[in-house]
Amino acid sequence: MRAGKKVGICMIYALFLFAVTYVLMLAFSKYRPYIAVGSAAIFIATGMLPFDQILGAIDFNVLLMIAGTMGLVQLFIDSKMPALLADLIMEKVPNVQMAAVALALFAGIISAFVDNVATVLMVAPIALEICKKLKTNPVPFIISIAVSSNLQGAATLVGDTTAIMLGSYANMSFLDFFFYRGRPSIFWAVELGAVASALILAFLFRKEKGAIPKGAARTKVTDYVPTFLLVGMIALLISASFIQNKPEITNGLICVGLMAVGMIYTFFKTHDAAAVTGPLKAIDFETIGLLFGLFLVIGGITHMGVVDAAAGLLAQMGGGNVFAIYTAIVWASVLFSAFIDNIPYVATMLPVVTSLAAGLGIDPTVLYFGLLSGATLGGNCTPIGASANITGIGILRRDGHEVKTSDFCRIGIPFTLAAVIPAYIYLWLMYGV
């Protein structure tokens, strides 16, 4: 009895420290990396995250992907390709409003097949170039790109880690995300949400009616090799998703490896040390530090049973009503994923959902899809709810722009609601009725 009470008290301590950490990060956006790392140190020092679990809590694959892609993207920027793409987009859209929506949709398309963080790192430079040419604030542009990439992460098997987890757990193939058991699958639910959220973005940018100047000379690309390397990265990341039992850091090694290839190529071409120092300087170590700290914090509360307790509470909320359970899973997933990494949450909830469905004697598909859609989209509610958000904010900070929590939520919350509600209804009609 005493042991159980002690565990309960420790869980409360962990939950309290977790809550304080996130409140401080929301309130003091400039100091998020230091707050996260400081909180992680407390979790370790107090034993709430044991030493032997530290390495397991850190997602080195994500950190390597961010570092490698940032370096490769710097070579991409130096080649002038983002400036050319910005010119092409500006030629096709009538005003700033449609430029913002077009960039968000473009990011979403890429993100359906490539990791969300990599997508933001690739598309953000194009957005920054457009904003510089138009002399407009890039903050809402980058936020829109980040939330759109998060939305499309659930569209395909290779779009996001959580989608990969569900595919593996439920033995779903790449094509099962399009049509599953003879019915339109979750891909179409996500695209329905994408249409609704695009309308929301158009409304949020409704005042940006400034005309885009036409007739300007297109930027000349100085080197196409970085572009080929980025396209190669996309192809390799997609291909790697089909490899069974691959090392967990495979994607990270792909990104870092291609960055190294780009640096070596550029160095031998230019004989300039900037070919090496430039990409390395482009790596946002503050963003990496923030994610490093958050991985440890999430590892701490997971070890202390907070995530398991939250999953158990969610399982009890619906009672025996399937629609109530489905509703609870979707919206609780949205809420939890706004503040914690959705990877440990989804990993914990998948067996919970399976046992719930078995107990009720129902097909778990609707609960699986509800879990994935809610957990993937919930991260769009807050600036620290998803790695793509943190990455986008890091890019803006390096460009000299600070992002307030209110700035992010002004776009993130209505975007989330517009994306989740249609998907929530669609999935129930397809698989729940």
Language-model segments: residues:
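Hydrophobic faces of alpha-helical transmembrane segments in multi-pass integral membrane proteins
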Residues: 38, 42, 68, 72, ...
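Membrane-interface alpha-helices at helix entry/exit sites of multi-pass transporters
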Residues: 97-102, 132-144, 174-185, 359-369, ...
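Hydrophobic transmembrane alpha-helices of multi-pass small-molecule transporters
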Residues: 1-77, 180-312, 403, 410-433
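Flexible loop linkers connecting adjacent transmembrane helices
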Residues: 79-93, 131, 173, 208-214, ...
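Short aromatic-rich membrane-water interface segments that cap or initiate transmembrane helices
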Residues: 176-187, 316-320, 324
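Membrane-embedded alpha-helical segments and adjacent helix-loop junctions characteristic
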Residues: 52-139, 290-360, 364
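Helix-loop-helix connectors at the membrane interface of multi-pass transporters/channels
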Residues: 127-133, 168-170, 353-359, 391-403
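Alpha-helical transmembrane segments and, especially, the helix-loop junctions at the ends
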Residues: 111-121, 138-176, 197, 334-350, ...
